[in-house]
Amino acid sequence: MSLQNIIETAFENRADITPTTVTPEVKEAVLETIRQLDSGKLRVAERLGVGEWKVNEWAKKAVLLSFRIQDNEVLNDGVNKYFDKVPTKFADWSEDEFKNAGFRAVPGAVARRGSFVAKNVVLMPSYVNIGAYVDEGAMVDTWATVGSCAQIGKNVHLSGGVGIGGVLEPLQAAPTIIEDNCFIGARSEIVEGVIVEEGSVISMGVFIGQSTKIFDRTTGEIYQGRVPTGSVVVSGSMPSKDGSHSLYCAVIVKRVDAQTRAKTSVNELLRGI
């Protein structure tokens, strides 16, 4: 049986799987899948085009199964002690392994094993959960969190305190995805499998989930579940039909192309809106 088939079959019987009952075949399949996620050979989601992604459900199932096949134990990353089922990504790394990986991890940065961090990424004191993929040149700033199985594109900037939602708790169908060259402003939250498409700028303190209305003030269109390519987004509100109250929404105040984005600072894009 293929790795995928073993995982799929085991997941159907997951309620019966424990650290003592798991078969050697299933355990090795789960651990091998986690190793492939950790190395970047496998991803929970693969990009087909702008805003188009294929989710590898079986890889996500392997992540869930990994919690059933291992007991909690005392873990040590050299600085802190943990009591968990998942070791940190670089707990046992040598200097050569860090050099080969090619990213920076400052004191206080935590990534769990099973997450992938590409070259030229900077991890400030932040948290990258299992199954996540952080692509080349991304900045994960102080107190930012990258949730389980989330996909972070090339040259993305996650500002201080940003939260990118995971899929494991509560269980979600698709991971949250931030495509290439996006900027997510401080303390913003993108969750529940929302896709922020390439080259978008999310201002500080914007909260977007699947039910959040995303209003394009230029066209009058309302989006949900995705931020279109090149959008500049701020917090806003929409009036109720009877005008008695307003409810939170996100507002697309303008669109920018890659050329404009390259020539313009984020601060300039958010001025005069």
UniProtKB/Swiss-Prot annotation:
Its main location: cytoplasm. InterPro entries: DapD_Trfase_Hexpep_rpt_fam, Hexapep, Hexapep_transf_CS, THP_succinylTrfase_dom1, THP_succinylTrfase_N_sf, Trimer_LpxA-like_sf. It catalyses: (S)-2,3,4,5-tetrahydrodipicolinate + succinyl-CoA + H2O = (S)-2-succinylamino-6-oxoheptanedioate + CoA. Pathway: Amino-acid biosynthesis; L-lysine biosynthesis via DAP pathway; LL-2,6-diaminopimelate from (S)-tetrahydrodipicolinate (succinylase route): step 1/3. Its EC number is 2.3.1.117. GO terms for biological process: diaminopimelate biosynthetic process; lysine biosynthetic process via diaminopimelate. GO terms for cellular component: cytoplasm. Substrate binds at residues 104, 141. Keywords: Acyltransferase, Amino-acid biosynthesis, Cytoplasm, Diaminopimelate biosynthesis, Lysine biosynthesis, Repeat, Transferase. Coiled coil: none annotated. It is found in: Cytoplasm. Homotrimer. PANTHER family: 2,3,4,5-TETRAHYDROPYRIDINE-2,6-DICARBOXYLATE N-SUCCINYLTRANSFERASE, MOLYBDENUM COFACTOR GUANYLYLTRANSFERASE. NCBIfam families: dapD (TIGR00965), PRK11830.1 (NF008808). Belongs to the transferase hexapeptide repeat family. This is 2,3,4,5-tetrahydropyridine-2,6-dicarboxylate N-succinyltransferase. It comes from Neisseria meningitidis serogroup C / serotype 2a (strain ATCC 700532 / DSM 15464 / FAM18). The lineage of its organism: Bacteria, Pseudomonadati, Pseudomonadota, Betaproteobacteria, Neisseriales. The gene is dapD.
